[in-house]
Amino acid sequence: MANLEIIDQKGKSAGNVDLNEEIFGIEPNESVVFDAIIRQRAGKRQGTSAVKNRSAVRGGGKKPWRQKGTGRARQGSIRAPQWRGGGTVFGPTPRSYKMDMPRKARRLAMKSVLSQKVADKDLIILDQLTLEAPKTKELKAILDNANVSGKVLVVSDDKNVQLSGKNLPKVKVVPVNGLNVVDAVDYQKLVLTQDAIKRIEEVLA
């Protein structure tokens, strides 16, 4: 069972915590993580791109010239694909890019990412993370005290913390139920509180 140090908001040690081995100590499954990333990014696509085919282009109802006797190739409509201003063949149409993924696979992907963070020593645990008011300076000081640098993903339900992180470059604050595979992979450091760990273990256990 992984045992990590807990840090308070001033950067001092506040004890240790035992992490669930089945969540924070498994062998990461890269293929499942890859599938989860593809699924999440695909779900964000609008899927609204569209072009007009020959039936949607205005006009072209009349046959340009008679079928036989002109010496020219037969044509049925000036909106056929081979004409300038004609419709498009096999063009994009509105569609949904959402992909299905079993719940067990989605949870395995999240467990794999969390386990990799522990293995890489990129998981930082705070005893708590609260601010009395939205103060970017105070949140930056807390991260500096914890010796956190680079791209940082902070998991907190505190509204003041979420607002304080908006002006910090390379820092993103998400609620506990907003923790996802794409952000966890994209940001090098992951900052969790003890309460966040308990809720994560309740969901993924």
Swiss-Prot record:
GO molecular function: rRNA binding; structural constituent of ribosome
Family annotation (InterPro entries): Ribosomal_uL4 (IPR002136), Ribosomal_uL4-like (IPR013005), Ribosomal_uL4_dom_sf (IPR023574)
Keyword Ribosomal protein in annotation: yes
GO cellular component: ribonucleoprotein complex; ribosome
Signal peptide location: none
HAMAP family per record: Ribosomal_uL4_B
Protein's name in the database: Large ribosomal subunit protein uL4
Taxonomy of the source species: Bacteria, Bacillati, Bacillota, Bacilli, Lactobacillales
Protein's gene: rplD
